From Swiss-Prot:
This is Ion-translocating oxidoreductase complex subunit B. The lineage of its organism: Bacteria, Pseudomonadati, Pseudomonadota, Gammaproteobacteria, Enterobacterales. Binds 3 [4Fe-4S] clusters. GO terms for biological process: electron transport chain. [4Fe-4S] cluster 2 binds at C117, C120, C123, C157. Its cofactor is [4Fe-4S] cluster. It comes from Salmonella schwarzengrund (strain CVM19633). Residues 1-26 are annotated as: Hydrophobic.
Length: 192
């Protein structure tokens, strides 16, 4: 019984010593992130599609915040993201020109021709937001609520059964743009 308490005490002491070492190391060797990069990264849609020329949203945010990259390269975010970044960085909004892919004015949605789908799962692997579901050698389908229309699933398809189609706005698919609604703060007097 005495050896059990010695073992418990030794393990507790080791845990405390190593915990203190890890705590010291985490503070001593901590890397501070740039708060501007964090804010830019929060603005981006996090689709990790690579249409901006960077492997994901975080590297693009670092390029904009630290290297002065253009703010109009995010195709899925379009003009709304560009305007938010321009406001954050206090720069002039930049219209999309011929070099950058201009965001489509209509939301695009990937559609799979299920009769020609062979179930190879290449589109599932290419989708950055997991909007395509299906199993090996079974037909796949796109979940329209998750699809960003980034076009990354079209090229890997060996049977070319995926295409992007515009989504027609219906009362069910239309959403309020909350950034355009004017909001006023009305002061309220409190009576004692």
């Amino acid at each position: 019984m005495n050896t059990i308490w010695i073992a418990v005490g030794a393990l507790t002491l080791l845990g405390l010593v190593f915990g203190a070492i890890l705590g010291y190391a985490s503070r001593r060797f901590a890397v501070e992130d740039d708060p501007v990069v964090e804010k830019i990264d929060a603005i981006l849609p996090q689709s990790q599609c690579g249409q901006c020329g960077y492997p994901g949203c975080r590297p693009y945010a670092e390029a904009v915040g630290l290297q002065g990259e253009k703010i109009n390269r995010c195709a899925p975010g379009g003009e709304a993201v560009m305007l938010k970044m321009a406001e954050l960085l206090n720069v002039e909004p930049q219209p999309c020109d011929g070099e950058e892919q201009q965001a489509a004015p209509v939301r695009m949605l990937a559609v799979i021709d299920e009769n020609n789908c062979i179930g190879c799962t290449k589109c599932i692997q290419a989708c950055p937001v997991d909007a395509i579901v299906g199993a090996t050698r079974a037909m796949h389908t796109v979940m329209s609520d998750l699809c960003t229309g980034c076009n990354l699933c079209v090229d890997p398809c060996p049977t070319h059964c995926i295409e992007l189609r515009p989504v027609n706005e219906t009362p069910d698919s239309w959403k309020w743009d909350l950034n355009t609604i004017p909001v006023r703060i009305i002061p309220v007097e409190q009576h004692a």
